[in-house]
Structures are given as structure tokens and as C-alpha cells.
């Protein structure tokens, strides 16, 4: 089962590289036939939707990634960031682009707890401090 899921993920990357976006999406969705959705597949779907600037759809897939659990006990190749940090930081971007700054801030704080020194987290902190004019600690005053 895990080999089939992993094959779907690799096939999706190959299809996307060849410019076959729909086939890439199909390969990712096919992985759901073998077991519950993996964070890796959900993050890839979210990334593809962000690339198309479909931020609401991207947010859906990143939210699914956050609610999924890694299949570590099955011997699967697990990218741990796909179950916490990556969906959180990408949800911050999605909600900011959708104009929902309160949710964007929420996911920024979540990503900040996971990797406070990550360059993207630090950049987002500076962005929010400038954009929303809030103190470095606590919630932005504009929210």
C-alpha cells in the first residue's frame, strides 16, 4: 500500500514537470484510494492550487494536511513538515491573499511555534508588523 501511495506522489511530480497538471492532480487523488489522505499529497495539491492563485482551494488542501496523521508505523516515507509547519505557513499566505488577516495571523503564530527561527516565519513576522502595525508580541491591533 505505501509503495503505491509513494508511486502516486512521484507520478504526480513527473506529470507536473511534463506540464500535465490535470494528470498530476489525478495521480495525487488516486493515492487516496489506497489509504486515508497523506499530508504529503494534500500539501502537493495545495501547492498546485497556490500556483494557480486559487487560494481558497489551496487553503482547503492545507487544512486537510493539518488534520491528517503521518503513517510512520507503516514504513511510509514521511515528510514531517507536511503535517504541521508547511501547511501552517502556507495557510498564512493563503488567508493573507484572501484578505482574511485574522486567520493569516493565526496560522503565522502556529508556524512560529513550530519553527520560530525559520526565515519564512521571520519574514512573515516583519510583514505583519509592518502591514498590521502591531506589537512584536501579541495580536495585531488591526485584527
Residue ranges and their predicted role:
Residues 21, 55-56, 101:
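TPR-repeat structural position
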Amino acid at each position: 500500500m505505501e509503495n503505491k501511495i509513494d508511486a502516486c506522489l512521484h507520478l504526480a511530480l513527473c506529470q507536473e514537470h511534463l506540464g500535465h497538471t490535470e494528470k498530476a492532480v489525478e495521480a495525487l487523488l488516486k493515492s487516496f484510494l489506497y489509504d486515508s489522505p497523506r499530508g504529503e499529497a494534500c500539501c502537493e495539491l495545495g501547492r498546485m492550487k497556490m500556483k494557480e492563485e486559487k487560494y481558497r482551494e489551496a487553503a482547503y488542501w492545507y487544512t486537510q494536511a493539518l488534520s491528517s496523521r503521518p503513517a510512520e508505523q507503516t514504513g511510509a516515507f514521511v515528510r514531517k513538515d507536511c503535517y504541521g509547519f508547511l501547511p501552517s505557513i502556507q495557510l498564512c499566505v493563503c488567508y493573507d491573499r484572501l484578505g482574511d488577516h485574522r486567520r493569516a495571523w493565526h496560522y503565522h503564530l502556529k508556524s512560529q511555534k513550530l519553527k520560530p527561527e525559520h526565515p519564512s516565519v521571520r519574514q512573515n513576522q516583519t510583514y505583519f508588523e509592518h502591514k498590521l502595525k502591531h506589537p512584536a508580541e501579541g495580536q495585531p491591533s488591526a485584527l
